[in-house]
C-alpha cells in the first residue's frame, strides 16, 4: 500500500523521480516562503542542530537512527499518471476553472451569509445543508465555490468578502493580505471564542459542517481536483496568517478536514483490500469458471481505488506539511491542542499509515508544553493508543524515549493532567509488561494518600493492577470466582497490610481505603474475611498488623455507610445518585448484620490496647442500630454493654473515653425499644463513678497530702466523669458542687495537684452548659440568677487559674473562660430570647486586661521563647501551633461579638506582619469583620496599633536613629499592610484615611523637644509610617494635609537649621509632582482631556493646574492593546508636521520644574496652601503650559475650591467623631473587596 508522506523524508523527496501535483508544488513553494522566525510559532531551542536524535528535538532535518531501518522497507510511491490541473494558488496570469470562459455567465457576488447563518443557528441538518450547497455548486461552480470560501472567511470573524473579480485577478496570498487589511477587529473575540449563547455551539456545528462536506463529496467532488485542492490551498495560507482569528479558525478547519480525509482513506484501503481478495479469488478459478470481463472490471476498479487513494494521500500530505507541521507549536495554546488532538485520532483510526515514530515524536515533544490543555490532549491521545494492546506493542521506541516524562507528569501542577497521566501509566502497566521499573511505580504509590480524590483514585487503580491483581487474579479463573475466593481475599488483605506498613503513613488508613474503593471495593467490603483474620488465633499477626487491620476495617465500614470520602479529601461530587443511595443502604445493613454479633468479641480481645479499642467503638456510628430490635439481637447488646463498662473502667485515655461515651450516647436514644436497658446500664456506670469520686474527694479534702496512687485514681475518675458529662446529662448526680469546692481549695491553698484541676474545670464547665439547655421561658428569675451566680463564680476561678504556674491549667482556663463569656454575651438574647437577658454577662476591665496579657504571653511568642525546635518532633510543633491558633481564635471571637472592647484588637493587629505566617489568616479575618462592625473605629485601632509599637520602640531604643532600626522597618511593612487592607475603594474610605493622617500628625507632634534643644520631636519619625497611607489619598486631600501639617509645625518653638528628614519624607509622599517631573521633565504627558486655550494664568494658579495634570498622569501607563490585524502605518513625518504646525510666537526653552519653596534654614517650615512646586510659564505653544491638560473644574478660583474642600473635610470630621452604627456609615457588608482582599 502506498504510504503517506513522512515528516522525516521531506528533504529526501526532491530526489524522487515521481512527478508532483500542482497542489504539492504550491505547498512546497509556500513552505519555502515561510519565515522560520514567525511570530506565531513557539521558539524551539536547539531543534535544528545536526546529529540530534529525532526524538530529542523537532528538527527540520528530522532524521533518526531507527527511522533509517524503517525507511528502507518503505516502497516509494510510483509516479502518478499526468495529474489533474489543480492549481493550489491563483495567479493573475493563470486562469482557473472558477473564471467563466466567455460563456456569458453572470458573475454577481453570491450570498455570503447563507451557510454561515445556518451553521451558526445549528437548527438545520448538516447533511441537507451540504446537499443544498452541492446543488448550487453544480448549477454554478463559480458562485458555489465563492460561497464556500466566504463561509470560512466569515467563520474567522472577518466581515469582508472575496468577490469574483478578486479571485480572478489575485493570488491566494494577495487575497489573504487584502482580508487582513480589511479585518476590523473591534474586540479580541471571534466566532470560535466569542461569548454568549449564540456562539456556544458554533465550534461543534462548524466541525460537523466540515465533516459532512467531505462525507458528501467523497464519491463526487472530492476527486474532482478543483474545489477541494483550492480550498486546502486557501486554508494553508490562512493558517499562516498573523491574525489569530484566521490562524485559529483555518487550523481547526484544516485539521477536521484532515480527519475526515483519514476516514475516507481508511475506507478506500478497506475497499482496495476487498477488491484485491476478489481479484485473487477470481484469478485462482479454473479456465472454465474464470470470467475475463470480471477480472478486467476488478482491475479497473483497483486502478480507480489506487488513483483515489493517491489523491487522498496528496491532500493529506499537503495539509500535514502546510498546516500541522507549523501549527503544532503555534504560540496560541488552543491551536496546539487542536493539532495534538487530531493527530492522536489519526494514529488510532489509521494506524498503518500514521502510527510510526515520525508522527509520534510530535506528541512526545508536546508533552513538555507549558499550557495545561495541550499537555492534557497529549496524554489523552497517548491513552487512546496504549489502551489497544496491539497498537501499544508498536510504540516500544516511543515508550523508551518518553517514559521518564510521562512518569514525571503524575506530579503535574494541574490535577487534571496528573490524573490522566496516572491513567496512562496504568494502561502501559497493563499492556506493556516490564516497561515501568520499581522506581517509576514508587512515584505513584504515595499519591494514594494525597487530598485530591481524583488523583488518589487513579493512583489506587494503578496500585491495584500493579500489586493486587497479579496475585489475587492467579487464585481464581473467572472474575466471579475471584470475588468470592477466600484464598484470593486473604491474599489481598496480606498484600494490603504489607503495602500499608511500607508506606509509612500509618495514620491514614481512611485515605488508602478511599483510594482503592472504586477498583477494589468488593475486597474491602468483605468484612467477614477481615474479622476472621482478627479473631483467629493462628494468623500470626503482629501488634502493628492487627492495629492496621482494625483501621482498615473501620475505614471500610465508614466508607460503605457514609458513601463519601474521608474528611480532608477534595471531591467534586455533590451528592449520591439513587442507585448509590440504594447500594449504601444495603451495605449498611449487611455491615450491621455481620459486625453486631462480633463487636463484643473484638472488644474483649483488644480491650487492653487503647489504640485498638477506640476505633472499634467507632463502628457503632456506622450501624443501623434498629437491627438490635428487628432481628432479636438483644443478647449481643447485653454483651456490648458489659464490654463498654469494662473499657471505661480500664482506660483513662481521652480518645477511648470519648469513643465509649459517644457509643453509649448512640444507644441511649428514646426511640429505641431497648432504651430502658441501656439507660439502666448507664446509670449503673455513673453511680459507680460518682461513688468512687465522693470517696476519693473526701480523702483529699480531709488530708493535706496524697500519694501518687490516690492522685492517679482521683484524676482517672474525674476524667471518666468529664468525658461522660460531655455526651450525657449528669445533672441529677450533682457532682458540680463538689468539683467547685475542690477548685476553690486549689485556688486558695494551692495544695490540689494540677492533674486533678484540669478535669475538674471541664466538669464544672459542662455542668453549666447542661443547665443552660434546660432553661425555657417558664424558668423562674430565681433559677436564672442562681445559674448566673454559678457562672460568675466559675469565671472567677478560671481568672485565678490564669496566673497558675502550670501552663496546661492556664490554657485550659483561658479556653473555658473564652467559651463561657461568648455564650453569655449579648448575642444570647438574639432571636427572640429576651427571657435570657438576666444571664448576659460583661467582663470587668481587670478580666479583659488579664485575657489580653495571657494572649501576649502564650500566643505571640518570640522564636527564642518557643524552646529548641530541633529537640521537638515536627508533629509536636504542629500541635503546639494549632493550640496557639485556637487560643488566638477564641480571643478574636470575644472581640467581634462585643464581649471585649474593640480597642483591645490593637494587641492583635500590631502582630499582623510579624506573625503573618502563623496567624495571618485569623488576624485578616478579624480585621475584615471589625471593619464591617465599625469602619471608623477599626481605622483608629489600626493607628493605635502603630502608636503602641512606636511607643514601645521609643522606650527601648530612644528617639535617636529610629528609622534605621530593623524594628522600625518592620513597622513600615506593617503600615503598608494596613494601608492595603483598605482595598481599592478609595472614595469609600476617603474620610477614614484622612482622619488617620490627621490623628497621626497630631501624635507625631504631641511631644516637643525641650526648649533650646536642637533635637527633633521624639515622635516625629511616626510621619514615615503615615507616608505608607498616602497613596490612598485623593489629590485634594493631600493638599489639605500639607496645609494642616504647616499649621501644626507653626507651634514648634524652634525650627531646625535643615529640613527634618521625616517631614521631608512625608511631604514627598503627599507631593507626587516632584517625582513625576524629575522623571520626565520634557515631553507632554499623554492626556485625553481637552487643552485650555488662552493666556498664561498667574503663577500660583498655573502651578496648581500643572500639579493636578501631573497627578492624573503619574500612574502607570495603560498597556497597549495589540491587535492581530495588520493596520496601515501612519507616517511619523506627518505627525511631526502636525506638531510643528501649531501656532506659537517662536521657539522657547524647554519646560522646567522649579521648586518655589523649600524647607530651609533657621526659619519655620514655609508651606502654603498652594503646591510647593511651580512650572515656568512658556509663552510658546510647545511648552507644558499649553500641552498639559486640565479639568474644567480646575478653572475655578483656587481659593474658593480650597474653602469648599475644607468645609467638606470639617463635615467629615464631625461625622467621624460622632458615635454611629456601621449602617449609618453606609457600610456594605457584602462588599467583596472588604471580605476577600488578596493583597493584605
Swiss-Prot record:
Q: In which tissues is it expressed?
A: Testis specific.
Comp. bias (Basic residues): 1126-1141
One cellular component term from this protein's GO annotations in UniProt: nucleolus
Q: Which InterPro entries match?
A: ARM-type_fold, Cohesin_Scc3/SA, HEAT_SCC3-SA, SCD, STAG
Where Phosphoserine occurs, residue numbers? 1218
Modifications the protein undergoes after translation, according to the UniProt entry = Phosphorylated.
Pfam families in UniProt: HEAT_SCC3-SA, SCD, STAG
The highest taxon in the source lineage is Eukaryota
List the residue ranges of the region (Disordered). 1-108, 1077-1154, 1213-1240
- Where is this chain primarily localised? nucleus
- Composition bias type Polar residues, residue spans: 97-108, 1115-1125
Which keywords belong to this entry?
Answer: Cell cycle, Centromere, Chromosome, Chromosome partition, Meiosis, Nucleus, Phosphoprotein
Q: Which GO BP terms apply?
A: establishment of meiotic sister chromatid cohesion; female meiosis sister chromatid cohesion; homologous chromosome pairing at meiosis; male meiosis sister chromatid cohesion; protein localization to chromosome
Its annotated compartments are: Nucleus; Chromosome; Chromosome, Centromere
The similarity comment for this entry is: Belongs to the SCC3 family.
Mark out the compositionally biased spans (Low complexity): 1-25
Q: What happens when the gene is disrupted?
A: Deficient mice are sterile and their fetal oocytes are arrested at early prophase I leading to oocyte depletion at 1 week of age.
Record's function text: Meiosis specific component of cohesin complex. The cohesin complex is required for the cohesion of sister chromatids after DNA replication. The cohesin complex apparently forms a large proteinaceous ring within which sister chromatids can be trapped. At anaphase, the complex is cleaved and dissociates from chromatin, allowing sister chromatids to segregate. The meiosis-specific cohesin complex probably replaces mitosis specific cohesin complex when it dissociates from chromatin during prophase I.
Q: How does it assemble?
A: Component of the meiosis-specific cohesin complex, which also contains the SMC1 (SMC1A or SMC1B) and SMC3 heterodimer. Such complex likely contains RAD21, or the meiosis-specific related protein REC8. Interacts with CCDC79/TERB1; recruiting cohesin to telomeres to develop structural rigidity.
Q: What is this protein called?
A: Cohesin subunit SA-3
Amino acid at each position: 500500500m502506498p504510504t503517506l508522506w513522512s515528516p522525516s523524508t521531506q528533504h529526501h523527496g526532491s530526489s524522487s523521480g515521481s512527478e508532483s501535483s500542482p497542489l504539492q508544488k504550491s505547498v512546497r513553494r509556500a513552505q519555502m516562503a515561510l519565515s522560520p522566525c514567525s511570530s506565531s510559532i513557539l521558539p524551539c531551542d536547539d531543534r535544528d542542530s545536526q546529529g540530534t536524535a529525532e526524538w530529542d528535538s523537532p528538527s527540520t532535518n528530522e532524521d533518526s537512527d531507527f527511522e533509517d531501518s524503517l525507511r528502507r522497507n518503505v516502497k516509494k510511491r510510483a509516479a502518478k499518471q499526468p495529474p489533474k490541473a489543480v492549481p493550489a494558488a491563483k495567479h493573475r496570469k493563470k486562469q482557473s476553472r472558477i473564471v467563466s470562459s466567455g460563456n456569458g455567465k453572470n458573475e454577481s457576488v453570491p450570498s455570503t451569509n447563507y451557510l454561515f447563518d445556518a451553521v451558526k443557528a445549528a437548527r438545520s441538518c448538516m447533511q441537507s445543508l451540504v446537499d443544498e450547497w452541492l446543488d448550487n455548486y453544480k448549477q454554478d461552480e463559480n458562485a458555489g465555490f465563492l460561497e464556500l470560501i466566504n463561509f470560512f472567511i466569515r467563520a474567522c470573524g472577518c466581515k469582508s468578502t472575496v468577490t469574483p473579480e478578486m479571485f480572478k485577478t489575485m493570488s491566494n496570498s494577495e487575497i489573504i493580505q487584502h482580508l487582513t487589511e480589511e479585518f476590523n477587529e473591534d474586540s479580541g473575540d471571534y466566532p470560535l471564542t466569542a461569548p454568549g449563547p449564540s456562539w456556544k455551539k458554533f465550534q461543534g456545528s462548524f466541525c460537523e459542517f466540515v465533516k459532512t462536506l467531505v462525507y458528501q463529496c467523497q464519491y463526487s467532488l472530492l476527486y474532482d481536483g478543483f474545489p477541494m485542492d483550492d480550498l486546502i490551498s486557501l486554508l494553508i495560507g490562512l493558517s499562516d496568517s498573523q491574525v489569530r482569528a484566521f490562524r485559529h479558525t483555518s487550523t481547526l478547519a484544516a485539521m477536521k478536514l484532515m480527519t475526515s480525509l483519514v476516514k475516507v482513506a481508511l475506507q478506500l484501503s478497506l475497499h482496495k483490500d476487498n477488491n484485491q481478495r476478489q481479484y485473487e479469488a477470481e484469478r485462482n478459478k479454473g479456465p472454465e469458471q474464470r470470467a475475463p470481463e470480471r477480472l478486467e472490471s476488478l482491475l479497473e476498479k483497483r486502478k480507480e481505488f489506487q488513483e483515489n487513494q493517491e489523491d487522498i494521500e496528496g491532500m493529506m500530505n499537503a495539509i500535514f506539511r502546510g498546516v500541522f507541521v507549523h501549527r503544532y507549536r503555534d504560540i496560541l495554546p488552543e491551536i496546539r491542542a487542536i493539532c495534538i488532538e487530531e493527530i492522536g485520532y489519526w494514529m488510532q483510526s489509521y494506524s498503518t499509515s500514521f502510527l510510526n515514530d515520525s508522527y509520534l515524536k510530535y506528541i512526545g515533544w508536546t508533552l513538555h508544553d507549558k499550557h495545561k490543555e495541550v499537555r492534557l490532549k497529549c496524554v489523552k491521545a497517548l491513552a487512546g493508543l496504549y489502551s489497544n494492546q496491539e497498537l501499544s506493542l508498536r510504540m516500544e521506541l516511543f515508550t523508551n524515549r518518553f517514559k521518564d516524562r510521562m512518569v514525571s507528569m503524575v506530579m503535574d501542577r494541574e490535577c487534571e493532567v496528573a490524573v490522566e497521566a496516572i491513567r496512562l501509566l496504568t494502561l502501559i502497566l497493563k499492556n506493556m509488561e516490564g516497561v515501568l521499573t520499581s522506581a517509576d511505580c514508587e512515584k505513584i504509590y504515595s499519591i494514594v494518600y494525597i487530598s485530591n480524590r481524583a488523583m488518589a483514585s487513579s493512583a489506587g487503580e494503578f496500585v491495584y493492577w500493579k500489586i493486587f491483581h497479579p496475585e489475587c487474579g492467579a487464585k481464581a479463573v473467572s472474575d466471579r470466582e475471584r470475588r468470592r475466593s477466600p484464598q484470593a481475599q486473604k491474599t489481598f488483605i496480606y498484600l494490603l497490610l504489607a503495602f500499608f506498613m511500607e508506606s509509612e503513613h500509618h495514620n491514614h488508613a481512611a485515605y488508602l481505603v478511599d483510594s482503592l474503593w472504586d477498583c477494589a471495593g468488593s475486597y474491602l467490603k468483605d468484612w467477614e474475611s477481615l474479622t476472621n483474620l482478627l479473631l483467629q488465633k493462628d494468623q500470626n499477626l503482629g501488634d502493628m498488623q492487627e492495629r492496621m487491620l482494625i483501621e482498615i476495617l473501620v475505614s471500610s465500614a465508614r466508607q460503605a455507610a457514609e458513601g463519601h470520602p474521608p474528611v480532608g479529601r477534595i471531591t467534586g461530587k455533590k451528592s449520591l445518585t439513587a442507585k448509590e443511595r440504594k447500594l449504601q443502604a444495603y451495605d449498611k445493613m449487611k455491615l450491621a448484620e455481620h459486625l453486631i454479633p462480633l463487636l463484643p468479641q473484638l472488644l474483649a480481645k483488644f480491650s487492653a490496647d487503647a489504640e485498638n479499642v477506640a476505633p472499634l467503638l467507632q463502628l457503632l456510628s456506622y450501624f443501623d442500630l434498629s437491627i438490635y430490635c428487628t432481628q432479636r439481637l438483644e443478647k449481643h447488646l447485653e454483651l456490648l454493654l458489659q464490654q463498654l463498662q469494662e473499657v471505661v473502667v480500664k482506660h483513662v485515655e481521652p480518645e477511648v473515653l470519648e469513643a465509649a461515651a459517644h457509643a453509649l450516647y448512640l444507644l441511649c436514644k428514646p426511640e429505641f425499644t431497648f432504651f430502658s436497658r441501656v439507660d439502666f446500664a448507664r446509670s449503673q456506670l455513673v453511680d459507680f463513678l460518682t461513688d468512687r469520686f465522693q470517696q476519693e474527694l473526701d480523702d483529699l479534702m480531709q488530708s493535706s497530702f496524697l500519694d501518687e496512687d490516690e492522685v492517679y485514681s482521683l484524676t482517672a475518675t474525674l476524667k471518666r466523669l468529664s468525658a461522660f458529662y460531655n455526651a450525657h446529662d449528669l445533672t441529677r448526680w450533682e457532682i458540680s458542687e463538689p468539683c467547685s469546692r475542690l477548685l476553690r481549695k486549689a485556688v486558695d491553698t494551692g495544695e490540689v495537684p494540677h492533674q486533678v484541676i484540669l478535669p475538674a474545670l471541664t466538669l464544672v464547665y459542662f455542668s453549666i452548659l447542661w443547665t443552660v439547655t434546660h432553661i425555657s421561658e417558664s424558668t423562674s428569675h430565681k433559677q436564672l440568677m442562681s445559674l448566673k451566680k454559678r457562672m460568675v463564680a466559675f469565671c472567677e476561678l478560671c481568672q485565678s487559674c490564669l496566673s497558675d504556674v502550670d501552663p496546661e491549667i492556664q490554657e485550659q482556663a483561658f479556653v473555658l473562660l473564652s467559651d463561657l463569656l461568648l455564650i453569655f454575651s449579648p448575642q444570647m438574647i438574639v432571636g427572640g430570647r429576651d427571657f435570657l437577658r438576666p444571664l448576659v454577662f460583661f467582663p470587668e476591665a481587670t478580666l479583659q486586661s488579664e485575657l489580653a496579657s495571657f494572649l501576649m504571653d502564650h500566643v505571640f511568642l518570640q522564636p527564642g521563647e518557643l524552646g529548641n525546635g530541633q529537640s521537638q518532633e515536627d508533629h509536636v510543633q504542629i500541635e503546639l501551633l494549632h493550640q496557639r491558633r485556637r487560643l488566638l481564635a477564641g480571643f478574636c471571637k470575644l472581640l467581634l461579638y462585643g464581649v471585649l472592647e474593640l480597642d483591645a484588637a490593637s494587641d492583635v493587629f500590631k502582630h499582623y506582619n510579624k506573625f503573618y505566617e502563623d496567624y495571618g489568616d485569623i488576624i485578616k479575618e478579624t480585621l475584615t469583620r471589625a471593619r464591617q462592625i465599625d469602619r471608623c473605629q477599626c481605622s483608629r485601632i489600626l493607628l493605635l496599633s502603630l502608636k503602641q509599637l512606636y511607643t514601645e520602640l521609643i522606650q527601648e531604643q530612644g528617639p535617636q536613629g529610629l528609622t534605621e532600626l530593623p524594628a522600625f522597618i518592620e513597622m513600615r511593612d506593617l503600615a503598608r499592610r494596613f494601608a492595603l487592607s483598605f482595598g481599592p475603594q478609595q472614595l469609600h474610605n476617603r474620610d477614614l484615611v484622612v482622619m488617620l493622617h490627621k490623628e497621626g500628625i497630631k501624635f507625631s507632634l504631641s511631644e516637643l523637644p525641650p526648649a533650646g534643644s536642637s533635637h527633633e520631636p521624639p515622635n516625629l519619625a511616626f510621619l514615615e509610617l503615615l507616608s505608607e497611607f498616602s497613596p490612598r489619598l485623593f489629590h485634594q486631600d493631600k493638599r489639605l494635609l500639607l496645609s494642616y501639617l504647616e499649621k501644626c509645625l507653626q507651634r514648634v518653638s524652634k525650627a531646625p537649621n535643615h529640613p527634618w528628614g521625616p517631614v521631608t519624607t512625608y511631604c514627598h509622599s503627599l507631593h507626587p509632582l516632584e517625582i513625576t517631573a524629575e522623571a520626565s521633565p520634557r515631553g507632554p504627558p499623554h492626556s485625553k482631556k481637552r487643552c485650555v486655550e488662552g493666556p498664561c494664568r498667574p503663577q500660583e494658579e498655573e502651578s496648581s493646574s500643572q500639579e493636578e495634570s501631573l497627578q492624573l498622569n503619574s500612574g502607570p501607563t495603560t498597556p497597549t492593546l495589540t491587535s492581530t490585524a495588520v493596520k496601515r502605518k501612519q507616517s511619523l513625518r506627518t505627525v511631526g508636521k502636525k506638531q510643528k504646525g501649531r501656532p506659537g510666537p517662536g521657539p522657547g526653552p524647554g519646560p522646567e520644574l522649579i521648586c518655589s519653596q523649600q524647607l530651609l534654614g533657621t526659619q519655620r517650615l514655609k508651606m502654603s496652601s498652594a503646591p510647593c512646586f511651580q512650572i515656568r510659564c512658556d509663552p510658546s505653544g510647545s511648552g507644558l503650559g499649553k500641552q498639559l491638560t486640565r479639568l474644567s473644574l480646575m478653572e475655578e478660583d483656587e481659593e474658593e475650591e480650597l474653602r469648599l474642600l475644607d468645609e467638606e473635610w470639617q463635615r467629615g470630621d464631625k461625622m467621624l467623631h460622632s458615635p454611629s452604627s456601621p449602617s449609618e456609615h453606609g457600610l456594605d457588608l457584602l462588599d467583596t473587596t472588604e471580605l476577600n482582599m488578596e493583597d493584605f
